[in-house]
């Protein structure tokens, strides 16, 4: 008798659910995608106990026809595909017809739906079987309630992480969906508390303001670009808002959130030396393309995709991000609230509550005076962050909204705040601020520094003109400043009417020398300096194999390496621009780069060598400078293409505004 037999439908569905429904957030994702595909303009997501107890998604979409209800919970039953060719033209978020079948096999599901000019229907499914189907009162659209998730798969339920982790995952999904569909009003409610509420205005920057807060939203830079195959649109945050992980990078293809290593790499290359090693930007990029250029059917959750002409898209993203920051003033403001990571404390719920109440009482008793723009911004933030729990460093979950800042996605329990209901005044203030911000984005100007840039642009001086003739050179983004002195032989102190500046002298000279060496390495010429005594290098046999393979690439950066017999190689000349006292060390370091990488990317090699040389040749800390030397250094920095960060991404200049200084000394409150 044969041993192979076809599995029962209920068992097959449970197995399939293991791929589709990993956790509560998977259910939210699938139901939210269905609502969007149904053409909904309003979607409400309500969860209890982070979705473990219940998940309810209500939309005003097209609804489900009565005759289709019998098929809705069948595997591979869908209205989105019909023929094989349809797989190459997918524009909907869902298409496999697996979601409802998988969900209903591991949860108890109640679905109410109604289409135009039709009576409503209700259907109840448990363990994959329809137990009840009856007429019911229902508004146009679909109302689906998922209860007791994983009730019949206790092993899966056992490995659910903390409720705060699960709620963080749900918030992540909903926020990303809200960003990619700003024309849909989306609300997320957890245990009766509003976590997110978007207005459906169609403006992505408004959604990002709701998620990240106005401070980040005002420092977003709009990007847009086209090729014959791709159109990209999005916002990238200024480098000062970088984070410690990649979770703040949101990439969408035709409205679908995806993860792609090469596109992440393109974004980081676009920022290039503006980011410190180990830091990642906040950004949102939506890519519109013909569906035939992307295969979305390669991953159970459809997060990973395969792209055609990936290199073309890569270069488009890099170029548009670089253009976005090319002529901008990127001097970071001092963060007065910064606390070192080692001092980070996750307070208990009661401690947080007491701290907040004390802070609130103090703020209520203080008399504050701001400009009209600052007043509007702080009004918005006061309403939007009224019960914020203070954790002064990045927490794991990137998409904790400003109305739910307390969510921690580690397995640590931490209370989360109660949010006040948003009243009409709040929405009015929010709308005014965001409309003003949107107008600024439309003009492709950065809202947070527009006034500063306008003022500062009138105060750029030509270093050769002491009388202060204005310079129109767009490269000159460092404002004129008066040197005051030096701290610890490391930081230059300067001032102007905008406040005080601190300049890291090592980072400043490192940037200057980096651009010099980068240009020189990129212009390899026949101008060489002969050595009276050739430099000799000794390599093992395996190292020789690598070096022989990449000798031509070394020649492209000016190193003529010749085999001298046995394990020895010689260099008898070197490019004239090499610092004479470091020729041997530079050549040795360049060869070591090749031996370490076991491959050569000429662009990267030139980059690495330029960074290495600039770092070694720059002023070190505890090196005291004369005032004229400091002034000369600032003048040279003013001529740099990217004068705000060193090649490693560390800031060169930090600005303390006059207001911030007065606040430090309690001159203003």
Curated annotation (Swiss-Prot):
Coiled coil: none
Region: Disordered, residue numbers: 357-379
Protein family membership: Belongs to the DNA mismatch repair MutL/HexB family.
Signal peptide, first to last residue: none
HAMAP family: DNA_mis_repair
Name of the coding gene: mutL
Name of the protein: DNA mismatch repair protein MutL
Gene Ontology BP terms: mismatch repair
Organism: Staphylococcus aureus (strain JH1)
Cell membrane recorded as keyword: no
Pfam families assigned to the protein according to its UniProt record, in alphabetical order: DNA_mis_repair, HATPase_c_3, MutL_C
Gene Ontology cellular-component annotations: mismatch repair complex
Keywords attached to this entry: DNA damage, DNA repair
């Amino acid at each position: 008798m044969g041993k192979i037999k076809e599995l029962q439908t209920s068992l097959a569905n449970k197995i399939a659910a293991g791929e589709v429904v990993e956790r509560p957030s998977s259910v939210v994702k699938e139901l939210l995608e269905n609502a969007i595909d149904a053409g909904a303009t309003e979607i409400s997501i309500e969860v209890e106990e982070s979705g473990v107890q219940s998940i309810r998604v209500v939309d005003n979409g097209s609804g489900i026809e009565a005759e289709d209800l019998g098929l809705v919970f069948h595997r591979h039953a869908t209205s989105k595909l019909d023929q094989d060719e349809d797989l190459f033209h997918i524009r909907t978020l869902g298409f496999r017809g697996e979601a409802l079948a998988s969900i209903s096999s591991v949860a108890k599901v109640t679905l109410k739906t109604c289409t135009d000019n039709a009576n409503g229907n209700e259907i109840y499914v448990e363990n994959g079987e329809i137990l009840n189907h009856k007429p019911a009162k229902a508004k146009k659209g679909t109302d689906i309630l998922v209860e007791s998730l994983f009730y019949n798969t206790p092993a899966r339920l056992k490995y659910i992480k903390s409720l705060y982790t699960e709620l963080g995952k749900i918030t992540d999904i909903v926020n990303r969906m809200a960003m990619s569909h700003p024309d849909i009003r989306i609300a997320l409610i957890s245990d009766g508390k509003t976590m997110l509420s978007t207005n459906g205005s169609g403006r992505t920057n408004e959604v990002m303001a709701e998620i990240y807060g106005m401070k980040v939203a005002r420092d977003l830079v709009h990007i847009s670009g086209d090729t014959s195959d791709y159109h990209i649109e999005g916002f990238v945050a200024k480098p000062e808002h970088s984070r410690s992980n990649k979770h703040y990078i949101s990439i969408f293809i035709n409205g679908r959130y995806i993860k792609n290593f090469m596109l992440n790499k393109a974004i980081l290359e676009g920022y290039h030396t503006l980011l410190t090693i180990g830091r990642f930007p906040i950004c949102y990029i939506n890519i519109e393309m013909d569906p035939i250029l992307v295969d979305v059917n390669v991953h159970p959750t459809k997060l990973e995709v395969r792209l055609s002409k990936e290199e073309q898209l890569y270069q488009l993203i890099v170029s548009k991000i670089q253009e976005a920051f090319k002529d901008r003033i990127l001097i970071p403001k001092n963060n007065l609230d910064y606390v070192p990571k080692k001092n980070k404390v996750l307070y208990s719920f009661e401690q947080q509550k007491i701290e907040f109440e004390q802070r609130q009482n103090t703020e209520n008793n203080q008399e504050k005076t701001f400009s009209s723009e600052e007043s509007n911004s702080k009004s918005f933030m006061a309403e939007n962050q009224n019960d914020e729990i203070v954790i002064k460093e990045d927490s794991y979950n990137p998409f904790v909204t400003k109305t739910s800042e307390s969510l921690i996605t580690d397995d640590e329990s931490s209370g989360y705040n109660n949010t006040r209901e948003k009243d009409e005044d709040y929405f009015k203030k929010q709308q005014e601020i965001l409309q003003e911000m949107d107008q600024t984005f439309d003009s492709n100007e950065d809202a947070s520094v527009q006034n500063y840039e306008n003022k500062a642009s009138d105060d750029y001086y030509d270093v050769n003109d002491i009388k202060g003739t204005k310079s129109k050179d767009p490269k000159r983004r460092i404002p004129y400043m008066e040197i005051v002195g030096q701290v610890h032989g490391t930081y230059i102190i300067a001032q102007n009417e905008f406040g005080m500046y601190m300049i890291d002298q090592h980072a400043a000279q490192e940037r200057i020398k980096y651009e010099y060496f980068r240009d020189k390495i990129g212009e390899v010429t026949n101008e060489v300096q002969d050595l009276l005594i050739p430099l000799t290098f000794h390599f093992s046999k395996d190292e020789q194999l690598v070096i022989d393979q990449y000798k031509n690439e070394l020649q492209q950066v000016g190193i003529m390496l010749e085999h001298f017999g046995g394990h020895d190689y010689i260099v008898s000349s070197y490019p004239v621009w090499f610092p004479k006292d470091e020729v041997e060390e530079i050549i040795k370091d360049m060869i070591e780069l090749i031996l370490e990488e076991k491959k050569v990317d000429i662009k990267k090699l030139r980059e690495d060598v330029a960074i290495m040389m600039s770092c070694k040749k720059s002023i070190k800390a505890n090196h005291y400078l004369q005032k004229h030397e400091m002034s000369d250094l600032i003048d040279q920095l003013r001529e740099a293409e990217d004068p705000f960060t060193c090649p490693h991404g560390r800031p060169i200049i930090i600005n303390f505004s006059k207001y911030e200084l007065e606040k430090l000394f309690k001159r203003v409150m």
